[in-house]
């Protein structure tokens, strides 16, 4: 039975939650909103407590804002262990990827997991290399799935009373397409996902352009999961 309560007024994270409409416009994978949003969780050492908050673009990207805030507000010993999870509306650009790597090199006790709703200018070679460098540095990067969207809705959104289960359920195809392109990036393959926007009716179009190298390198079950590849396609 669905609870008739929204986030409790006694919830210490309530003032740091975003509104439902903000979550929708920032994290809908079909939208190409320019601004970025970051929802994050921090867990220190062996503590079970999780610190949650959010951030948005200012004059800097949200990733840089987080790093500045994190390093300035706490006397953080480099050897202290800390687990950080980011839920980003856009993947980091190459400059932010470099800043993240520098931050992690100065704080070897920090582990970082990044979930992204969309890939930022994924055709740009510098952005692609930046994401590969992060992965090679030990950062986990994944596309947000339904479970991550629900987690964010429950823990970061000031949803109305009774609407805990009424989180936005976006079509899984968009998530699968972005996940496929992320595989291409990590494996140093050419882009396979083309994205275009028709501004008159605000529709976003996704198109797959697979080459032989994609069929040769990407596991078949990942390609088949999109539902756009026929099982009879010959893998070489």
Curated annotation (Swiss-Prot):
Q: What is its main location?
A: cytoplasm
Biological process GO annotation list?
chromosomal 5-methylcytosine DNA demethylation pathway; cytidine to uridine editing; establishment of localization in cell; lipid metabolic process; lipoprotein biosynthetic process; lipoprotein transport; mRNA modification; mRNA processing
EC number of the protein: 3.5.4.-, 3.5.4.36
- Enumerate the Pfam families for this protein: APOBEC4_like
Binding positions (Zn(2+)): 61, 93, 96
Question: What's the superkingdom here?
Answer: Eukaryota
Please list the reactions this protein catalyses: a cytidine in mRNA + H2O + H(+) = a uridine in mRNA + NH4(+); cytidine(6666) in apoB mRNA + H2O + H(+) = uridine(6666) in apoB mRNA + NH4(+)
Tissue localization of expression is:
Expressed exclusively in the small intestine.
Per UniProt, the cofactor note for this protein states: Binds 1 Zn(2+) ion per subunit.
Protein location: Cytoplasm; Nucleus
Q: Catalytic center at which residues?
A: 63
Domain spans labelled CMP/dCMP-type deaminase: 10-134
Cofactor(s) essential for the protein: Zn(2+)
Give the protein's biological function.
Cytidine deaminase catalyzing the cytidine to uridine postranscriptional editing of a variety of mRNAs. Form complexes with cofactors that confer differential editing activity and selectivity. Responsible for the postranscriptional editing of a CAA codon for Gln to a UAA codon for stop in the apolipoprotein B mRNA. Also involved in CGA (Arg) to UGA (Stop) editing in the NF1 mRNA. May also play a role in the epigenetic regulation of gene expression by participating in DNA demethylation.
Summarize the subunit comment. Homodimer. Interacts with A1CF; form an mRNA editing complex. Interacts with RBM47; form an mRNA editing complex. Found in a complex with CELF2/CUGBP2 and A1CF. Interacts with HNRPAB. Interacts with SYNCRIP.
This chain belongs to the protein called: C->U-editing enzyme APOBEC-1
Q: From which organism does this entry originate?
A: Homo sapiens
Q: Which gene encodes it?
A: APOBEC1
């Amino acid at each position: 039975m669905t609870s008739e309560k929204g986030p409790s007024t006694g919830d210490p994270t309530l003032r740091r939650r975003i509104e439902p409409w903000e979550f929708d416009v920032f994290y809908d994978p079909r939208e190409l909103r320019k601004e970025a949003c970051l929802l994050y969780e921090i867990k220190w050492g062996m503590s079970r407590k999780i610190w949650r908050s959010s951030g948005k673009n200012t004059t800097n990207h949200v990733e840089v804002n987080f790093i500045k805030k994190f390093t300035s507000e706490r006397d953080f010993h480099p050897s202290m262990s800390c687990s950080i999870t980011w839920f980003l509306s856009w993947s980091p650009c190459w400059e932010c990827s470099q800043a993240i790597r520098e931050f992690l090199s100065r704080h070897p006790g920090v582990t970082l997991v990044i979930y992204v709703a969309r890939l930022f200018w994924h055709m740009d070679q510098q952005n692609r290399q930046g994401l590969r460098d992060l992965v090679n540095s030990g950062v986990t990067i994944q596309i947000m799935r339904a479970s991550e969207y629900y987690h964010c809705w429950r823990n970061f959104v000031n949803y109305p009373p009774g609407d805990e289960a009424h989180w936005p359920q976006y079509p899984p195809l968009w998530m699968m397409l972005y996940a496929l392109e992320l595989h291409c990036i990590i494996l140093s393959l050419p882009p396979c996902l083309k994205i275009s926007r028709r501004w008159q009716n605000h529709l976003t179009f996704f198109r797959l352009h697979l080459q032989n190298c994609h069929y040769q390198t990407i596991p078949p079950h990942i390609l088949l999961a999109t539902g756009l590849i026929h099982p009879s396609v010959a893998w070489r």
